[in-house]
Amino acid sequence: MELSLDISRSAMLQYLQDKNWMEPYEEVLRLEKPGEGNMNVVVRVVGDTRNLILKQSRAFVNKYPQIPAPIERIGVERQFYTLAASLPELRKYLPWVVGFDAKSHLMVLEDLGKGADYTFIYKKEQPMAAEDLSAAVEFLKVLHAQKFDSETVRAFPDNLALRKLNHEHLFVYPYMENNGFDLDTIQPGLQALAMTYKTDSALKQKVSALGEVYLSAGGTLLHGDYYPGSWLRVNARFKVIDPEFCFFGPAEYDLGVMLAHLRMAQQPEADIEKVVEQYGGEINSGFVGQIEGMEILRRIIGLAQLPLELTLEEKEALLKLAAKKITSNA
């Protein structure tokens, strides 16, 4: 099946019932677009008794069809959900996997309900509620604390093809002097500002070294893209979705990415400090800082832009801080 909103209700019902994912007495009322999917095609099936979320990967990035992407990524995401949901402490944060069609690269998830992600915190003076921020840290802390046996780690996909694609946008593309992306179309003056970092050979060397670590294996199960777009608030509860970039790697990666987004969203410094304090554990704070710096740089001068409400001067201050975190923590 090729997933789209144009599929008839009867065809969708037949497909889901043939797979035993809907009961014979259930009906499909309509199909909806649940949100803006970057990587995959996502459809909400609204039924008379319950709703389902269908998610299908294609051989390209859904938002940028010109960018090839490994079609197997949906299977990796499914394995993350299966592994993480086996842990009672994490189950409450995640959607349940209803079914998986390997041939169609399609996964069916329970619909957590109509909510909103946390990208609203990028707007001016929109602090994240204390209980939600605490839940975001708790999920990461519990996930990273899990100790899996060597057989489980070996059997889990390395997700290397998707990581290599991501590596390009994290560690390479933002630092290319002529990558075809005019940052002045995002904000006048940003292109000239970015050139400071695109031409900094010492910084680029440190970033390249970080990229090698990103592509290496580790022993901690990571979400892989832990930022406000992967967090949902549904029925006053914090949820986590979209772990398609997951892999076993260094815990510092997820934490550094999270801190970077809180900083770009201009969350209070005291809240950022609370995140580190609550997470606790034995982590390499210098490495966390480097990942934080990398994520800030790639989001401001790279392709994957955010809805930041920052002046050019505020972005300049963030870029300076990010570069310092990368070079001084090496």
Residue map of PLM features:
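Juxta-kinase regulatory segment immediately upstream of eukaryotic protein kinase catalytic domains
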Residues: 1-30
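ATP-binding glycine-rich phosphate-binding loop
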Residues: 25-47
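Active-site Asp-x-Gly
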Residues: 64-66, 73, 219-221, 232-273
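ATP-binding pocket architecture of kinase catalytic cores
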Residues: 44-155
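Catalytic-loop signature of eukaryotic-like protein kinases
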Residues: 225, 229-231
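Active-site activation/catalytic loop segments of kinase-like enzymes and analogous catalytic loops
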Residues: 79, 252-283, 292-311
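Protein kinase catalytic-loop region centered on the HRD/HxD motif
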Residues: 146, 211-220
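Active-site catalytic-loop/activation-segment of kinase and kinase-like phosphoryl-transfer enzymes
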Residues: 1-8, 155-210, 301
